[in-house]
């Protein structure tokens, strides 16, 4: 968390060098959103199997969507210092592109803390499920480019990531 005067960031999850969950009980619930992305880079043999509908475990794109939705709701179980918050909406898009499989998630809540980690967890869990579903076709599949694209709401204000070209 940054100081509004531009001073050095404060580490809010540590007190006396020990990890702790930040107390958000005094914060009012507000509407917050976060959008994240990830890429799954496919070697030619994995891409060919996907396009031919010959993936050993079924449709990885559909499974990835469901996995991403589940990941957004289970973030507090996986990221130790995250608060369990109500995910009021989650959308996960999984699209085959020339550069690979592009995964995006948009997560919303009305809570005293944000949903950035929920969006990032959604795309990461979705990407890992794609890897699992396609690993029989190649071990050279790569998960790449996991990042926060935007966030709205909260004390730290809105954020918009810089544009960048698709992953190679």
Curated annotation (Swiss-Prot):
Class of this enzyme: lyase
UniProt protein name: Cyclic pyranopterin monophosphate synthase
InterPro entries reported for this sequence: MoaC (IPR023045), MoaC_bact/euk (IPR047594), MoaC_sf (IPR036522), MoCo_biosynth_MoaA/MoaC (IPR050105), Mopterin_CF_biosynth-C_dom (IPR002820)
CDD domains tied to this protein: MoaC_PE (cd01420)
Active site: 132
Function: Catalyzes the conversion of (8S)-3',8-cyclo-7,8-dihydroguanosine 5'-triphosphate to cyclic pyranopterin monophosphate (cPMP).
Entry similarity comment: Belongs to the MoaC family.
Binding sites annotated in the UniProt record for substrate: 81-83, 117-118
Its EC number(s): 4.6.1.17
GO annotation, biological process: Mo-molybdopterin cofactor biosynthetic process
Pathway: Cofactor biosynthesis; molybdopterin biosynthesis
Annotated HAMAP family: MoaC_B (MF_01224_B)
Subunit relationships: Homohexamer; trimer of dimers.
Gene transcribed to yield this protein: moaC
Catalytic reactions of this protein: (8S)-3',8-cyclo-7,8-dihydroguanosine 5'-triphosphate = cyclic pyranopterin phosphate + diphosphate
Protein species of origin: Deinococcus radiodurans (strain ATCC 13939 / DSM 20539 / JCM 16871 / CCUG 27074 / LMG 4051 / NBRC 15346 / NCIMB 9279 / VKM B-1422 / R1)
Keyword vocabulary terms for this entry: Lyase, Molybdenum cofactor biosynthesis
